[in-house]
Amino acid sequence: MAQTTGFTVWLTGMSGTGKSTMAAYIAARLRQVDRNVEILDENELEGALWQGMGDSKDERNTLVRRLGFVAGLLTRNNVAVLVPCVSPYKAAREENRRTIGRYIEVYVDCPTEKLIERDSTGRYKKALSGEIPNFIGITEPYEPPASAEVVIHSDQESVEEGAGKIFQSLLDLGYVTSEELKIITGKKMKAQPPTKTPVTRVSSAKPAKAAKTAAKSGKGTKARPAARAARVAKPAKKAAASKRKAR
């Protein structure tokens, strides 16, 4: 019989790290065990939740709170909710944690140099050149979580490996059962005492020069993933001139 415990999995990280891909993968597997699942993707819900809004810090936080409000309603009604959202500011994420309750935070991390390399849209390079203003991680800071339940390094770990971490955390917190996960993964998983491993990142890093250099040379210096998540490039002078969206 399907479990009815609702919960929210909030996937945060810079644009292009793989949050939406991970959310879709998790949702498909939860549906295998008859879970009611909803994905609240900030990009897909643009017209409904933030049409006409700009990219200021307050406006971004308003979007995060709106997604959190909807996620909270669904969670209370026994829905498994997955929210892939850049959500760059820690205070808004923590507010959602408090109000939603049954909540796990997943930090999907990837070095900015890698994001630039694999960005087929060219948005990162445009942001570095000043063509796209208010781009998180380039001209605006991203605040990495200090104690996310799950950290996924998407440049090093596969979707399956990252999903395994999320399923383990859901099991540890009692949001899914070992029987469900045996159907999903084919393995017998055991709950472990939940622990939070702090992510050793600067809590409010500022953009720097590293990614701009990487964009020109195509090479980046080695570093722990997301040590440069927000240490990337100086804000371009053109950035303040427009309010074009860049998610």
Give the location of each predicted region.
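Phosphate-binding P-loop
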Residues: 1-6
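The conserved Walker
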Residues: 15
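Conserved glycine(s) of the Walker
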Residues: 18
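Polybasic, lysine-enriched low-complexity intrinsically disordered terminal tails
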Residues: 179-247
